[in-house]
């Protein structure tokens, strides 16, 4: 029996869509704290799910459910349209459950993520940032992979802003550039980072260079340690010979 309309999958195809999830927290100035905020709340924060470079993700993401700490009233918040975020105030850090619900055309089950809310600066210069009351940003780059998507969902994933189909052909660099110029959707990581988005090809290449340099340093350290070991064994053998101590032989 043939598959019902809209239930056929595009075989042999996997499509990924990138997004960013995380939180931003800003400490209150004690002298300018809003009157409605509880006395023990020290920060205002927001938790979010958004596209890379704030690209629209609502064509594949229907809604997002945030499960906050049980001490919050209505601690399960469902956001059904962009921006997919929740803003609150508080004093403590905790794990936030984030559940992604996809559009009906996808036929996909919800996926769950976890994010650790950060209120206090971390990493290098944390104390300076704390004194300046800087915004604490904790976010992660993630990719959703849709394997063999339903045909209607495939059309949504590959369509442009007006559900225009992408051009068929060999593709390549020129096709990607054309899609970007006409505002088409792309899953490509941007070439350069921006203040709003630290994820880019440039950042990726810098990290690869850093890892390569670290690997070379480790290899050099291993080489030097091996040379020192050989030298020590040589001196030990000379000492044994001068003292008339027979050299140790390895048992077979």
From Swiss-Prot:
GO CC terms, sorted: chromosome, telomeric region; cytoplasm; NuA4 histone acetyltransferase complex; Swr1 complex
Compartments it resides in: Cytoplasm; Nucleus
Biased composition (Basic and acidic residues): 203-213
Skewed-composition ranges (Polar residues): 189-202
InterPro entries membership: YEAST_sf, YEATS, YEATS_dom
Residue span, YEATS domain: 9-160
Protein keywords: Activator, Chromatin regulator, Coiled coil, Cytoplasm, DNA damage, DNA repair, Nucleus, Transcription, Transcription regulation
Entries under Pfam families matching the protein: YEATS
Entry keyword annotation includes Transcription: yes
UniProt entry tagged with the keyword Coiled coil: yes
Compositional bias per record (Low complexity), positions renumbered to this chain: 158-168
Region (Disordered): 156-219
Family, per entry: Belongs to the YAF9 family.
Comment field on protein domains: The coiled-coil domain is required for assembly into the NuA4 complex.
Protein name: Protein AF-9 homolog
Organism from which the protein derives: Aspergillus fumigatus (strain ATCC MYA-4609 / CBS 101355 / FGSC A1100 / Af293) (Neosartorya fumigata)
Lineage of origin: Eukaryota, Fungi, Dikarya, Ascomycota, Pezizomycotina
